[in-house]
Amino acid sequence: MKILAISDIHGKKSDKLIDYLKKEDISALLIAGDITDFQITEFEPLSFVKPFIDEIVEEADVDVFAIPGNCDPAGICNAIKESGPDEKPAFCMHNQLIAYENVVILGYGGSNPTPFNTPGEVDDDDIYLRVYELLAEYDYIGNTDAKRVTILLTHAPPYDTKADLLPDGTHVGSQGVKKPIHEFQPNINICGHIHEACSIDKVGQTIVANPGMLENGNAILIDIDEDAKFTVEIVEL
């Protein structure tokens, strides 16, 4: 099974994305936040969400799992849940977990505070509490005999990794994401937020992957076999 991850769309469609999804026979698309942007003035920001996701599902026949970013306005989760056809609706994974084939996806959107006063900012201590609770819930109820890949989907990247690195060398990620990754070691963390930080890194045994801004033309491809063995790579759309 192939899963593609993208992030930071900011209201800009990509024909290359749909072409790639169809060509590579992708089963699911993960969206790590900032589908739209509260600063958009040419159209109502939330009006972008449903047509964007509908086209992806209808053209490429993929399941869509998405979370809010810090730039997504209030109402983003409802907009995500109202997207996709009735037989294949999109899922808003904010503060949720779901089993999908031999994968468990756990999601938490928004970001730690930024200098820009964006609508989806969350105190880092609160991020830690929520992400910890999600991972602890799966750790408690999960069947350890089942071969599954755990994917933590966050908008904010874990602090002090390649995924949170600004061009000037400053790390601006979330300790609230990094600490529970250290404690529970999910297999993969897909994140976004830092547009220039397209990268693959590790926190302990957890692979941390940031696809960067969609407009830059990259994504993360996760390939999982029936024994839950997997690879993670950066791909060009």
Predicted regions and their residues:
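Conserved catalytic scaffold of divalent metal-dependent phosphoesterases
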Residues: 72-172
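Active-site neighborhood of phospho(di)ester-bond hydrolases with catalytic His/Asp-centered motifs
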Residues: 5-8, 29-34, 64-70, 91-94, ...
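Beta-strand-turn-beta hairpins that frame and shape the catalytic cleft
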Residues: 1-4, 97-107, 145-151, 202-207, ...
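Core catalytic region of metal-dependent phosphoesterases/phosphodiesterases
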Residues: 13-100
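Conserved beta-sheet core of the metallophosphoesterase superfamily
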Residues: 160, 165-226
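Short, flexible loop segments at the rims of nucleotide/cofactor-binding pockets, characterized by
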Residues: 5-11, 40-45, 165-169, 186
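Short, conserved loop/helix-junction motifs that constitute active-site signature segments
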Residues: 22-24, 54-61, 144-146, 181-184, ...
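Short, solvent-exposed aromatic-acidic interface loops
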Residues: 232-237
